[in-house]
Amino acid sequence: MAGGATPGRAVVLETGRLLLRPWRVAEAVVQRELWTERDPRVPPHRRIDADGHPTVADLEESIRANRPSSIGLLAVERKAARDVIGYCGLIDSGRGPEGEPEMAFELLRRVWRQGYATEASLAVLDWARSSGYERLWATVWEWNTDSRRVLAKVGFDEAERKEVDAVYGTTLFTARRL
């Protein structure tokens, strides 16, 4: 199936501890913090550049420009603290088969190893299944053992496909049937 995406309809997901929802402009500072925390092994186009971009203003504009939809990276908010700690969701990165979006997540370092990535990922998987997707996939750097562990916990299996980059390392492709 091409997915249960309903154009123009925002997705909001809830778990015991989390709310996954569209980003708000004021939360661009959280996105900027994610950019600043990225591992130096991540390619430059996904890190802050020499001129300091993306800036908070750049990210605010990006949030304004992105209309809520049924596919995208949702802000992950802790319900008890009412703070945004990262993102999780589905993207169409163009690297996978038609109708099979990629699941992606990234959380602030200060909340790692508390089960939030697993909890958010399971909510996205449940939503994807109920929306009619049959399979999802995810990419992960071979050196990113924490994210590989989360993907394994939620049922993703590493595929034979890999992309090797002599500078940044190997990207592993994982998939999960729903």
Question: What is each of the regions a protein language model found here?
Answer:
Residues 106, 119, 146:
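Short alpha-helical segment within the catalytic ATP-binding CA
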Residues 113-118:
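Glycine-rich acyl-CoA binding loop
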Residues 138-148:
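Conserved beta-strand-loop-alpha-helix junction that forms the acyl-donor binding cleft
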Residues 151:
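Conserved active-site tyrosine of GNAT-family acetyltransferases
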